[in-house]
Design a protein with these regions (language model features):
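Primarily recognizes the serine-hydrolase "nucleophile elbow" in alpha/beta-hydrolase
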Residues: 3-76
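Loop/turn elements at helix/coil->beta-strand transitions in domains of secreted/extracellular proteins
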Residues: 16-18, 55-59, 116-118, 145-150
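Mobile cap/lid helix-loop segments that gate and shape the active-site cleft of serine hydrolases
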Residues: 36-42, 48, 71-111, 117
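Short beta-strand/loop motif that positions the catalytic acidic residue
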Residues: 115, 120-123, 127
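Conserved alpha/beta-hydrolase "acid-adjacent" motif
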Residues: 128-137, 161-162
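Histidine-bearing beta->alpha loop at or near hydrolase active sites
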Residues: 154-161
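Catalytic active-site module of serine/aspartate enzymes centered on a nucleophile-bearing elbow/loop
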Residues: 165-194
Length: 194
């Protein structure tokens, strides 16, 4: 998809040097993988017509995506993530604990290294499906490698984010990184609005 966008950038008015990806839940996992495997040849693949174009992205917006499959059951959740019927096990084709190497390969947390694009993570502390810990450990791993990462913690928040977060955080995050406008968004905790 990223290569396709670059190949058609002039037709759609896309700046090839400023591509951000945004995903929630399973989509958050996918954008986390895109960001942490940015430029890793083994993850480039050979599918599609536009292999001459880069699949690198320049910013990641992660809404409560899984980041370390094998640690998901270490924290409260309504899902038994090690079950054969869990979303993570279905993705891998087997229960995650039966394929630990594949589980790690499919987890953004295990691909964090230096020189990654900036991330902003959003996660509720009461998320019943993807434990808050998933964004926290990815954020901390990013910082440990001197990458830019911001975590917006929603105290009492569930598996969703308020629509006003787009204007409050996402647009300013992109403005700062892509256009040097405004100020940098910093990690913070917000109470869930009732």
């Amino acid at each position: 998809a990223i290569r396709w966008l670059r190949a058609h950038s002039s037709k759609y008015g896309i700046n090839k040097k400023k591509i951000a990806v945004w995903g929630a839940s399973a989509g958050g996992h996918l954008v986390g993988m895109l960001g942490t495997t940015n430029g890793v040849k083994d993850f480039e693949g050979t599918v599609g017509k536009f292999l001459e174009y880069s699949s690198k992205v320049q910013a990641i917006i992660n809404y409560y995506g899984p980041s370390a499959f094998l640690q998901m059951d270490d924290h409260p959740s309504k899902i038994n993530h090690r079950s054969p019927s869990s979303p993570e096990s279905k993705l891998l084709g087997k229960p995650i604990d039966q394929v630990p190497d594949l589980s790690k390969q499919a987890s953004p947390f295990h691909h964090v290294k230096v020189n990654l694009p900036p991330f902003i993570h959003f996660h509720g502390t009461k998320d019943p499906l993807v434990p808050y810990h998933q964004s926290l450990i990815l954020h901390e791993a990013m910082l440990k490698q001197k990458n830019e990462s911001c975590l917006i913690t929603v105290r009492g928040g569930s598996h969703s984010m308020p629509p006003d977060f787009t204007d409050q955080f996402v647009i300013p995050f992109l403005d700062f990184h892509f256009y040097s406008l405004g100020s940098q968004i910093h990690s913070q905790e917000i109470k869930q609005k009732r």
